[in-house]
Amino acid sequence: MGDLSSLTPGGSMGLQVNRGSQSSLEGAPATAPEPHSLGILHASYSVSHRVRPWWDITSCRQQWTRQILKDVSLYVESGQIMCILGSSGSGKTTLLDAMSGRLGRAGTFLGEVYVNGRALRREQFQDCFSYVLQSDTLLSSLTVRETLHYTALLAIRRGNPGSFQKKVEAVMAELSLSHVADRLIGNYSLGGISTGERRRVSIAAQLLQDPKVMLFDEPTTGLDCMTANQIVVLLVELARRNRIVVLTIHQPRSELFQLFDKIAILSFGELIFCGTPAEMLDFFNDCGYPCPEHSNPFDFYMDLTSVDTQSKEREIETSKRVQMIESAYKKSAICHKTLKNIERMKHLKTLPMVPFKTKDSPGVFSKLGVLLRRVTRNLVRNKLAVITRLLQNLIMGLFLLFFVLRVRSNVLKGAIQDRVGLLYQFVGATPYTGMLNAVNLFPVLRAVSDQESQDGLYQKWQMMLAYALHVLPFSVVATMIFSSVCYWTLGLHPEVARFGYFSAALLAPHLIGEFLTLVLLGIVQNPNIVNSVVALLSIAGVLVGSGFLRNIQEMPIPFKIISYFTFQKYCSEILVVNEFYGLNFTCGSSNVSVTTNPMCAFTQGIQFIEKTCPGATSRFTMNFLILYSFIPALVILGIVVFKIRDHLISR
């Protein structure tokens, strides 16, 4: 290949890495730390897809199988860093998922993953591997120190507060984060730390449990060249501290070539090569493809092992070349050495223990308390979200206020009609404002819980419950602000007790709307779809259950039965009784009667109550109990849904 001096760690870019003494399982010195090994033996993964669209019933049994991984075997030891190269769709991320036990249920996995010669069981993967994904899923309104502090509280049982804080400070120092410890994480709209620093925070969160095997899915994605190089050098340093580091990478610079202990190349799920940088140069030289001088070996070998699909001729030509190289590797001494190392570790008389992460997590309620504090601190710092949450109902109420101004007692001037219209809006709009809050705020927390639950920090339902508990005081305050302004200004029933009942009756649908949205967000990934579904359910509930548009007693039996399962029925009856009971109406001048104007049929509020919802007066307390029973029912349903989500995603 020519002079490789420009590719060494001390080359032109000045990438200095302490190579240290790589721990080797073959004759390791007595003073070396405990060595560990990771082996993947004959890993294959395939998924099946329907031949035609889902609506084509005739083809429901016709499927085609796509092979994503094909007989991949790798071996790496502690103190080493392995880089996995490959074009898009080559199977790099799937291979990491296979290593970490995160493959989906939709496919079929064949092969074994060995750590220290022991085949891992499904429940052991989570406790053995730390996995840093491409995207940094962090809460933007927390500082770096707070982010790591809360992660540590979730991962490690708190003992001595001093030693606990020292752990966080030590990890920040190890990853050069101390100078930004008190800065917010931030996001695209909120200033914060840089993208490279966010990536280091994600790595630091994993280091808190002292993992011995760390996996990184394209850790340099979205970073500039210098920052990407710094991240790779950091990972090399982590590997030198008796860890196994495996990462996928996209278009690395040539200066990094000699930093990796092993380099693997995938093409369409097949392992084209896996060995040291020196072995790679010799192997491709022997295949007749020497890397040109002054070329980036990563780019050269990536192009060499990729299939060009721009034309049929080029596809055939490049496919033959890739197959030739893959066949040569399978027959090479490098491949045989990999298989031999795995088999040797499997048959040791005394197998080393599997290096699990620090596993001393706190109890369920302790984790729930930590999550509640973290969620509250993160959301309270979002000033716009807090203002929106508190004033959203009020803004809707101001529109009603300007439109109606003040209700009257004269039936001919809309005394009943205005009140019914207001109650209809109260019942229909309050669940929707709750839904808007959840759709706006919870998806970020859901993404965090999806990742952290796979890391074994907690279960997804705990994040959902923490959010639900966080919602309660904000919802109470928001409802009281709305009620205080609208109730008295609109001139509704002038009794303080009635005001209290009114506020309590509106708090329930607001919470129900938000909790119903949480349940659906546990089922449906797209928040826009959840928005539409909740809106449709709210509209349907008001139409069927409120009795404002059509008397429930006059509805067809199926709709009448459905109305009993809508919270709008009970909320509407409470509001109607609360407002109309004890009211007396006038009907124009004294000489106007029912015979001259049918609208004068209702001169007392009780008459309207008995006409629209008979017996609601005697059911007032029961309606409150039933209305508020929807809240714990939705919370329990949400826990079940998120437990199922946890099972589906984590397994």
Curated annotation (Swiss-Prot):
Glycans are attached at residues 584, 591. Residues 1-32 are annotated as: Disordered. Changing residue 99 to R: In STSL2; uncertain significance. It is a multi-pass membrane protein. It is an enzyme of class 7 (translocase). The ATPase activity of the heterodimer is stimulated by cholate. Taurocholate, glycocholate, taurochenodeoxycholate, glycochenodeoxycholate and taurodeoxycholate also stimulate ATPase activity, but to a lower degree. Glycodeoxycholate has no significant effect on ATPase activity. ATPase activity is inhibited by vanadate and by berillium fluoride. Changing residue 540 to F: Strongly decreases cholesterol secretion into bile. Keywords: ATP-binding, Cell membrane, Disease variant, Glycoprotein, Lipid transport, Magnesium, Membrane, Metal-binding, Nucleotide-binding, Translocase, Transmembrane, Transmembrane helix, Transport. Residues 1-383, 443-467, 522-528, 645-651 are cytoplasmic. Residues 388-645 form the ABC transmembrane type-2 domain. It comes from the Eukaryota. It catalyses: cholesterol(in) + ATP + H2O = cholesterol(out) + ADP + phosphate + H(+); sitosterol(in) + ATP + H2O = sitosterol(out) + ADP + phosphate + H(+). GO terms for cellular component: apical plasma membrane; ATP-binding cassette (ABC) transporter complex; plasma membrane; receptor complex. It holds the Pfam family ABC2_membrane. PANTHER family: ABC TRANSPORTER G FAMILY MEMBER 28 (PTHR48041), ATP-BINDING CASSETTE SUB-FAMILY G MEMBER 5 (PTHR48041:SF113). It is linked to Sitosterolemia 2: A form of sitosterolemia, an autosomal recessive metabolic disorder characterized by unregulated intestinal absorption of cholesterol, phytosterols and shellfish sterols, and decreased biliary excretion of dietary sterols into bile. Patients have hypercholesterolemia, very high levels of plant sterols in the plasma, and frequently develop tendon and tuberous xanthomas, accelerated atherosclerosis and premature coronary artery disease. The Walker motif (consensus sequence G-X-X-G-X-G-K-[ST]-T) is expected to bind ATP. Within this motif, the conserved Lys is essential for transport activity mediated by the heterodimer with ABCG8. This is ATP-binding cassette sub-family G member 5. It comes from Homo sapiens (Human). The lineage of its organism: Eukaryota, Metazoa, Chordata, Craniata, Vertebrata.
